[in-house]
Amino acid sequence: MSDSPLSKRQKRKSAQEPELSLDQGDAEEDSQVENRVNLSENTPEPDLPALEASYSKSYTPRKLVLSSGENRYAFSQPTNSTTTSLHVPNLQPPKTSSRGRDHKSYSQSPPRSPGRSPTRRLELLQLSPVKNSRVELQKIYDRHQSSSKQQSRLFINELVLENFKSYAGKQVVGPFHTSFSAVVGPNGSGKSNVIDSMLFVFGFRANKMRQDRLSDLIHKSEAFPSLQSCSVAVHFQYVIDESSGTSRIDEEKPGLIITRKAFKNNSSKYYINEKESSYTEVTKLLKNEGIDLDHKRFLILQGEVENIAQMKPKAEKESDDGLLEYLEDIIGTANYKPLIEERMGQIENLNEVCLEKENRFEIVDREKNSLESGKETALEFLEKEKQLTLLRSKLFQFKLLQSNSKLASTLEKISSSNKDLEDEKMKFQESLKKVDEIKAQRKEIKDRISSCSSKEKTLVLERRELEGTRVSLEERTKNLVSKMEKAEKTLKSTKHSISEAENMLEELRGQQTEHETEIKDLTQLLEKERSILDDIKLSLKDKTKNISAEIIRHEKELEPWDLQLQEKESQIQLAESELSLLEETQAKLKKNVETLEEKILAKKTHKQELQDLILDLKKKLNSLKDERSQGEKNFTSAHLKLKEMQKVLNAHRQRAMEARSSLSKAQNKSKVLTALSRLQKSGRINGFHGRLGDLGVIDDSFDVAISTACPRLDDVVVDTVECAQHCIDYLRKNKLGYARFILLDRLRQFNLQPISTPENVPRLFDLVKPKNPKFSNAFYSVLRDTLVAQNLKQANNVAYGKKRFRVVTVDGKLIDISGTMSGGGNHVAKGLMKLGTNQSDKVDDYTPEEVDKIERELSERENNFRVASDTVHEMEEELKKLRDHEPDLESQISKAEMEADSLASELTLAEQQVKEAEMAYVKAVSDKAQLNVVMKNLERLRGEYNDLQSETKTKKEKIKGLQDEIMKIGGIKLQMQNSKVESVCQKLDILVAKLKKVKSASKKSGGDVVKFQKLLQNSERDVELSSDELKVIEEQLKHTKLALAENDTNMNETLNLKVELKEQSEQLKEQMEDMEESINEFKSIEIEMKNKLEKLNSLLTYIKSEITQQEKGLNELSIRDVTHTLGMLDDNKMDSVKEDVKNNQELDQEYRSCETQDESEIKDAETSCDNYHPMNIDETSDEVSRGIPRLSEDELRELDVELIESKINELSYYVEETNVDIGVLEEYARRLAEFKRRKLDLNNAVQKRDEVKEQLGILKKKRFDEFMAGFNIISMTLKEMYQMITMGGNAELELVDSLDPFSEGVTFSVMPPKKSWRNITNLSGGEKTLSSLALVFALHKYKPTPLYVMDEIDAALDFRNVSIVANYIKERTKNAQFIVISLRNNMFELAQQLVGVYKRDNRTKSTTIKNIDILNRT
């Protein structure tokens, strides 16, 4: 394929290209020392075989031999080649073998695999022992280690185990040394549990710790049978290794404690520095510190040391680990694997895309070539067609020049008339503008009046609410004042009572003091006199002994009776006080009831007065509402009648205007036709046929339809242009009016055959019956294919079908081809066509008398309308007054009702108080039984008191008689002294009685004072509360009155503004009526001027029609626009091509109806005249249309018209007879564009694939280089380690496929001392252990890990090898911590720290011992 950027051969070759490109240039750029070992300078450079695109993969293990520095490729070493081996470096100075082996030792090749391909070319390169000296290797190690050197490392200081496995309670294992510690103890003591505890903290599962579940890790013994949890805490510290070989603790970094706790429910928790954490955080932390938890290099368990070296060369499954994956993860090249796989998948997808795009490209190329011949033919046709269009353009422009010269004079006259009409219109527009301004002002005033009315209603409602609030507050004020007056009256009387009671109490207290003083004096006197009396009696003791004893006996008997008398006397006083209190209470309650009943009677009287007032106001309101409702009905009826009158008035105005216009047209038409008919009869003109509408007939039912669809039925039909010109000259000369003419000789022959119409609706032309067939063309020229529909629905269905039609309905609605709809309205056009019944077409014509009559009727109707409008306005004003008075009545009613409601609530409260007072009085009166009880009790007490006095009277008389006897015995002296004593006693009794009476009165007065003070406090509190409440209410009442005053002010302002606005509205109404009169006058003037313009425009129409046809023909000319297509054919300019090509197509000009004889016709004519200018080449563009030049007037006059017409005929014949598909150019252009697009698309796809290939090569090269660099270091370190451990053996890591290390993996080959090369699987147990340890130590040297835990790795080793391993761990691995469990003394004796483990009572314990000898030696 000629233009394909990628041939099939190239594509096949590219598909066979290897995934990894290893060219000489890349090898030369790779100069990293650590990726290769330089060969001797004297070694000749080998001839490398050319790398084939596809190569077979071999699974045969081969020994890796490195080439020179200029070439980094590896080759398999054949078994039959004899070469010197790599010199095995030693960390110690080389010594001569005791067995006589030379320093230059030569390695033997590993055994060939049976499956090794014999066809592969292999080169054996001899390595230089000098170049591979110990010094060179040491440089490589130092360079690598310096890049990964750390400042400090992590080590385990101690383990704290609590109830973990065999460790009961809390046991501390350690501390451990920073480098080499050994865990020792007898079998079964729990040494391996130390490692299990570390694994437990590092997140290993229970099965790795030789248990099934986590709960099995909890210690269980006879002493501790049911512990719930166990825990292990690993205490880490950071240590810095000094260059001297010692180490010190890094004090700047704090220690790290990681704890894990397991529970009986098999769950566990992690802690970092005693804060709860998670498995993820713990493992992330340990990995960041360099502990390899992925491949577990730090952990070598019992019996697992051999597994490291026995790994397969490459993992068989993705989930497995082989030696290749093991090394890649350590070296770090495993990160490249997903990127390489992603790029390889992209290349496969892109190869498919390239193949698909190439196939598409070939198809497009074939299609493009098949269109070449058609393209050339189409280009020739386009050239001829362009010449024909240019010639036609010249001919049209020449004819236009002739027509424009005829038009100039006509335009001047029309321009003058238009100017006059515009002046009148400007005046009219100013009047209209003023009317609109007045209407806007009236509307604004009306809105403001409406706003005032709304505000008025709002103020009325607000006043109603404020009045209600005021009444409520005034009633509350009255109640509070009444309450305060009552409280103050009570307060005054209470103060007076308190004053009287306090005075009485003070007086009684004075009397009490006076009586007490007198009693005291009398008591002293009585004692004195009694002492004298006793002395006298003592002197008469013997004489009166018996009598005195008798008196004493009687007095003792009388003593209880005296006590009873005193008690009865006290009870009588209490009963008298209770009786007095009951009588006083009843009197007060009776007085309270009488006062409340008087108040209720007054309130009821006031309430009745309010109810009568409300009833009267409601009657007035109902009467007002009825009156307003009736007024609204009358106003609505009058308003509707006014609107009807206005509609009739407007219709009459329209009729008057139409009558005037019709009269003017009829007079003009009649004059024109009559004059031209006379001219025909006189023989001065030939070929005049009359009005077009009179030259045929149509059915009556289509009169409105044809009159609406064809206003040109008023056109005059003549045979020739000359006849029409004579007619125009005659009309202009005699100023008879204007006419529009149809020239039969200039009409082209139309296809008059019937057409297929939607729904078979009739064509208007087919319904006309011409008087003479020669008039058919004239009718068709004005009617065309206009259809007649029965209704608007059918007209819509017909007009908007697949093919557009001009449709008119029988009732005069017209749908044009453009989709515009017209017709309808109050005035229906009719009478333009002669009807089949020969009815006159003068139905809508008016005589001057009829026009005068119509205008008189219009004036009368306008006067009636004005009177009716004033009456309606008066009704509206009266109705408004009624509406305004209604809220006042409602406010008065609301106020009275609120006052009545307030009074009713007060009355209810007063009645409730009366009921309570009556109930209290009735209760007090009904408690007569209590009063009777008190009175009876008082009588009973008095009777008992009298009885007691009667009982004691006899004894007192006996005592009196006995005392008289003593008096007789004592003589006058005794009698006189006894009289003194009795006199004093009587006085004392009188005073004691008075004192008791005073104390009782004082106690009562004190109670009255307390009671009056309590009443005083209550009254004062009531007065204070009422006063505060009264202040609040007075403040509210003040604000309410202010709000009412403000409301009144706003109401007055609103009403005044409303009156003012109404006056302004009336003034504007009068102005608007005056303006409307001037507008009506303008309409009459406008009709006259339009009639004049119609006459001028009819003269212009014919000239314009000729120019329009010529311009139409000129404008329809266009050169086929193939510029875009030809540009697409230009290969040099083609960048991107669109598939769509636009062509200029000739648009069919549909018939457009001529201007109607109304205002729109005249406006269109004015606009066309104003915008039309004769063709002026200098003032227009240089081109008629694209590619067609516009000629100047001089150029047009110099044209040879006959020659142009001859050429047009010749070219027209060629164009019509030649059958050419122009679309082939577009198709060819599209194919060419697609060809280039496909080509560019294919090139981009190939470029993208090559870019991905290049990225893949870079990734593979990076992976290969980095892996080989690390692999060589590890391999050479392995040699060193194995030779050191085995004292003369050799070990190598080899690539199974030396050309591609990642295809078959890595194998581990070992040559034990004095033996040949062997695979790791063929070694003994001890040899496997030594090989694995050598690999572990080599990996440690390449990528150290800070911690190693080894469990009896020396089990399969003899004494010598154990010592070698132990010494290596002690001397060469001081940059890591080794914790080794061992039972071999030549292993643990070299440790700096010994951790002893022993078991007692099934519980493991630990102790730590420092190896002083070793520490002193170091």
Swiss-Prot record:
Q: Where in the cell is it found?
A: Nucleus; Cytoplasm; Chromosome
**Molecular-function GO term, any one:** chromatin binding
Q: Which UniProt keywords apply?
A: Acetylation, ATP-binding, Cell cycle, Cell division, Chromosome, Coiled coil, Cytoplasm, DNA condensation, Mitosis, Nucleotide-binding, Nucleus, Phosphoprotein
Respond yes or no to whether keyword Cytoplasm is given for this record.
yes
| Major localization class | nucleus
Region ranges (Disordered) = 1-122
User: Which superkingdom does the taxonomy of this entry point to?
Assistant: Eukaryota
Q: Which residues bind ATP?
A: 185-192
Q: Which residues carry this modification: Phosphoserine?
A: 113
Query: What is the official name of this protein in its record?
Result: Structural maintenance of chromosomes protein 4
Task: Give me the gene this protein comes from.
Answer: SMC4
